[in-house]
């Protein structure tokens, strides 16, 4: 695929991935407007992996992992970063070739570079999800993850969904040949050059300070409990509302991650909180499946 975008900028790099996967037939959807720790939390992955309905999509997802913050001092460790998620259901037999095609679209020459698929099965304890998978290593550095979902929210995936997750900053650093994420060129156009650091460095400094020092522990514990209560109430309605209930799951998960960053949860408590999130996610998954089933799985028609 020839692209009109400059892959040597972070902006052009993302546009190229979107264009490539659009040409493969994916719906290019927009990022979820909530704090999540990974692109898998997006309903287009978590919920759409359930049931028999086919659905292929691709999207950028901003991810927040409060414990990974380093006050803007680490060149490749961030508490806020981007993933590019591709979800293919049912998973095509040539998914590996499609992925390699995306690297070629980004200007990675397979004749020069060493691309390896290293077995690494994936699990998300909070989402009750797991799958068979591989890490993708480019010249010895992990840049992507492949997963064939076997189970989501405790439910078997049939057909199997194929998921590809790109670590955007890491892959872009490789393509731009820089050692610090803050040195990535975001865009270079008529209005001048803008760097990743111009866009996000101050955010990393301030959010790290908030995550580790100022997030209100008492408020976060209450928020977690409130989200759990709201989730259960929404699923207990005469006509359950699994989509709003799922938003409560994500809010509870983020509250837990902030509590983790504040070291407010002991090791034993930590497992208990993970189990509470997983119980919510499982209930949502079952309710969503039943709702689609009641509609006759319309996308199968």
UniProtKB/Swiss-Prot annotation:
It is found in: Cytoplasm. One of its GO terms (molecular function) is ATP binding. The keyword Nucleotide-binding applies. GO terms for biological process: glycyl-tRNA aminoacylation. Pfam families: tRNA-synt_2e (PF02091). Its main location: cytoplasm. InterPro entries: aa-tRNA-synth_II/BPL/LPL, Gly-tRNA-synth_heterodimer, Gly-tRNA_ligase_asu. One of its GO terms (cellular component) is cytosol. The keyword Nucleotide-binding applies. It catalyses: tRNA(Gly) + glycine + ATP = glycyl-tRNA(Gly) + AMP + diphosphate. Keywords: Aminoacyl-tRNA synthetase, ATP-binding, Cytoplasm, Ligase, Nucleotide-binding, Protein biosynthesis. PROSITE patterns: AA_TRNA_LIGASE_II_GLYAB (PS50861). Its EC number is 6.1.1.14. Tetramer of two alpha and two beta subunits. Belongs to the class-II aminoacyl-tRNA synthetase family. HAMAP family: Gly_tRNA_synth_alpha (MF_00254). This is Glycine--tRNA ligase alpha subunit. It comes from Shewanella loihica (strain ATCC BAA-1088 / PV-4).
